[in-house]
Amino acid sequence: MSIITDVYAREVLDSRGNPTLEVEVYTESGAFGRGMVPSGASTGEHEAVELRDGDKSRYGGLGTQKAVDNVNNIIAEAVIGYDVRDQQAIDRAMIALDGTPNKGKLGANAILGVSIAVARAAADYLEIPLYSYLGGFNTKVLPTPMMNIINGGSHSDAPIAFQEFMIVPAGAPTFKEALRWGAEIFHALKKILKSRGLATAVGDEGGFAPRFDGTEDGVETILAAIEAAGYVPGKDVFLGFDCASSEFYDKERKVYDYTKFEGEGAAVRTADEQIDYLEELVNKYPIITIEDGMDENDWDGWKKLTERLGKKVQPVGDDFFVTNTSYLEKGINEACANSILIKVNQIGTLTETFDAIEMAKEAGYTAVVSHRSGETEDSTIADIAVAANAGQIKTGSLSRTDRIAKYNQLLRIEDQLGEVAEYRGLKSFYNLSK
């Protein structure tokens, strides 16, 4: 009764109006699962391959019909007949069917869509929530959210190099309260921006994208919004950055060139100067997490950054690790970073996603489950964060339904868990000494 009888993919649109995949899996019992695949704007060069059509006459070359056809004509034939509950076997079968190290033949987007849909169908068959199916009986930790309320870099047209300015309501007693705090700060920030005559349009991830006078102006404005909402920076609410440094790293000159986003007169920094600058910000502001502070291939820089700041903040590897256990293992061995960002489409299956989370935890690294800038209404990452007891999630600002869908799912999960639910706040940053 739990045998897969049909797999079907279609092309749908993501939050940027670009094509992506939606996959449906059906079983003999009538149990059903659907998965939708996100897409990134600033992507690591070592990520699994997102297969696009390249036909400029259709969606500007971004169509996903090749990936859809791979699901319907190749993958479906391979997985029909499997027990839908055998997630690892199905994921491994798809990896073997692709046969490349980066899923470049079938496409990580094709494989991931099936992987998510299989898990959802299994949960439906067992009549249990997805987080319970993926995580088992010890699932209980609601993640501390990192809310991207200012969008810069490749996620907006704002003249700021850093891609994300985040608030982290780690002092809240519950996830529900953390979400409320974040929403109140978001609206307080909007009022401040309006009072300054700055734009309140939002970027890809729902954060504002105003023309600040540099990074520190953005930080100071966020701190003012936290206080205006009635909260205390550094006690109730902390700050975080996604620098996305690879987006403005000049490989030929080996410098971090802020002029790419901030224009003429902006800083151009060596690796050591980049670390000095980040340390200045950490010493001045209540920053608790810095993602991709160095270029994805700057291993020496990552090691120095971790040595300097790894006890004060969590240096998080996103483009640096690309949710891949091979890169993570190297990072652990070389003492680079102390946290990994988890993006399901960077690696392409749920099995490999959980492998990366487990490896991180065993090494004392934290795992931050994350969305992509091109999202859908699919809320699977909310269930993954709870299933893995990851303790941290990054899923955008307090606007745009593609972001709110994940927050609302976490509210449902918190309700379902009842008294068992734990919101650990600062304790989720167990890799820090402060």
Curated annotation (Swiss-Prot):
Keywords, ordered alphabetically: Cytoplasm, Glycolysis, Lyase, Magnesium, Metal-binding, Secreted
Catalyzed reaction equations: (2R)-2-phosphoglycerate = phosphoenolpyruvate + H2O
Co-factor binding comment: Binds a second Mg(2+) ion via substrate during catalysis.
Chief place where the protein resides: cytoplasm
SMART domains hit by this protein: Enolase_C (SM01192), Enolase_N (SM01193)
Residues annotated for (2R)-2-phosphoglycerate binding in this entry: Q163, K343, R372, S373, K394
Active site: E205 (proton donor), K343 (proton acceptor)
A GO MF label: phosphopyruvate hydratase activity
Gene Ontology BP, a term: glycolytic process
Binding-site positions, Mg(2+): D242, E291, D318
Pathway: Carbohydrate degradation; glycolysis; pyruvate from D-glyceraldehyde 3-phosphate: step 4/5
EC numbers for this chain: 4.2.1.11
Subcellular location: Cytoplasm; Secreted; Cell surface
Co-factor(s): Mg(2+)
Keyword S-adenosyl-L-methionine: no
GO cellular component terms listed in the entry, alphabetical order: cell surface; extracellular region; peptidoglycan-based cell wall; phosphopyruvate hydratase complex
Xref: PROSITE patterns: ENOLASE
HAMAP family: Enolase (MF_00318)
Function: Catalyzes the reversible conversion of 2-phosphoglycerate (2-PG) into phosphoenolpyruvate (PEP). It is essential for the degradation of carbohydrates via glycolysis.
Family note: Belongs to the enolase family.
Protein name, entry field: Enolase
Species of the source: Streptococcus intermedius
Taxonomy of the source species: Bacteria, Bacillati, Bacillota, Bacilli, Lactobacillales
Gene: eno
